[in-house]
Every structure is written in structure tokens, then in C-alpha cells.
Amino acid sequence: KNMITGAAQMDGAILVVSGADGPMPQTKEHILLAKQVGVPNIVVFLNKEDQVDDKELLELVELEVRETLDKYEFPGDEIPVIPGSALLALEALIENPKTQRGENPWVDKIYQLMDKVDSYIPTPQRETDKPFLLAVEDVLSITGRGTVATGRVERGTLKISDTVEFVGLKPTQSAVVTGLEMFKKTLDETLAGDNVGVLLRGVQKKDIERGMVIAKPGTITPHTKFEAQVYVLTK
């Protein structure tokens, strides 16, 4: 459930596979889910490289990963695969948080991974010119500040002091935006593609729940009948 909720918001993903063990059953499940919910691009990190003494074994694991990606209609031959050790990189950064490129081989592997993410996963065109819409993923109550709804901005822009409506599941209500936050940074404005927390005035936590949307007033109407394409996942 959580994998589906998160994956549905992604422009791309990093698939982490143990270089020592190879693809596990949940690896295939995650690739399948990524395909079905529309994650367009994947980059692979072969973890635990430090535990593999035989380079040929690591190459066999990489080949197996590429074949698995092909099976689920990702371009296995093209997808970047970066070996490394998350643990050794983390230990190096804990010992010296200011470690730069070229100063530690394991930290360099993480830089290489992120370089591939930047080059292989394109930044999609964002629909910033359309009316604001955010799908609510979670709702929090912050003492003394108000109610915060978090989620991904599907389209449009939003600024502090804007009025919004929250629609679906319950009667439509409106509220004023008093704050915007993303990755512990406060914002004056949020754009399509951002994962953001929206602080709302004049609304209780019980009034909003996951599955609702926050939208520009008058732009979204709730419906009780619709057509959908559904994937049913079996164990």
C-alpha cells in the first residue's frame, strides 16, 4: 500500500539491489508496481559491493537485474547500474561530514549514482499554467499553528494567503493557506511537481483525509460515477 502511494508520485526511482544476494522476490514486486503505477524511469544501485570478492559475481547480479527489468518492459540494456556500498559511504560521511568528491571511493559511488539520476531521469514538463491541484497523502495537526495537509502538487501554483477548497469524501470546504513547507524549508510559493506541506487556517484535522484533493476554488467537482482502469494485485 505504501509502495503504491509513494511510487504513484515519482518521476523516477532508484532500485536498490543487494550485490551480494541478487534480486529478491520483493525486488520484482517493486519493479512490477513501478511499471503499473507509471514510474517512467529507473536507475539501479547495486548495494553491498564491499561484500562481493568476485567481480564476475557482481556482473552476474547486474545481468540478472537487467533481465528482470526487461521482463517488466523497462529498457534493461539502457538503465544505468551503479555498484557501491551505502553503509561504507554513510560511515565515511559520519566520520567526516564534509567529505568531497575524490576524497573517498565509497562516497564517490553515491555521487556517481546521483549523477546518473540527473542525466538519465529527465525533468518532466510541469503544468504550472493550470488551476492548482494537490492530492492529499497525509494530514497533521501542529499545536499553535493549525492543520497541515501533505502531498504532491499535480498542477498549477500556490502562494501563501491563497484560498483553496478541499474536495472529495466529505462536504467541500474552503480555507486560507498560511504556510508552505518542503523538506523542512519554508516557501513563499509551490509549483507543480513539488511534494509539499500546506498549512491551513480555519480547518480541523478531522475535516481533511487522505484521498481528498486541495484545489483552486470552483475548479474541481466531486463525482460518484466514473470509469477507471484498475490493476488488482494478488499475493
UniProtKB/Swiss-Prot annotation:
Tell me where the signal peptide lies: none
User: From what superkingdom does this record's organism come?
Assistant: Eukaryota
- Localization (cell): Plastid, Chloroplast
Cellular component aspect of the GO annotation: chloroplast; mitochondrion
Catalyzed reactions: GTP + H2O = GDP + phosphate + H(+)
What PROSITE patterns would the database entry show? G_TR_2
* Record-listed GTP binding positions: N47, K48, E49, D50
Looking at the Swiss-Prot or TrEMBL record, what is one Pfam family this protein matches? GTP_EFTU
- Its EC number(s): 3.6.5.3
Keyword terms, alphabetized: Chloroplast, Elongation factor, GTP-binding, Hydrolase, Nucleotide-binding, Plastid, Protein biosynthesis
Q: Which GO terms describe its molecular function?
A: GTP binding; GTPase activity; translation elongation factor activity
Instruction: Give all residue intervals belonging to the tr-type G domain.
Output: 1-125
Q: Which PANTHER family match?
A: ELONGATION FACTOR TU, CHLOROPLASTIC (PTHR43721:SF5), ELONGATION FACTOR TU-RELATED (PTHR43721)
Q: Which family does it belong to?
A: Belongs to the TRAFAC class translation factor GTPase superfamily. Classic translation factor GTPase family. EF-Tu/EF-1A subfamily.
Q: What does this protein do?
A: GTP hydrolase that promotes the GTP-dependent binding of aminoacyl-tRNA to the A-site of ribosomes during protein biosynthesis.
Please state what the protein is called.
Elongation factor Tu, chloroplastic
Question: To which species is this protein native?
Answer: Gonium pectorale
Gene field: tufA
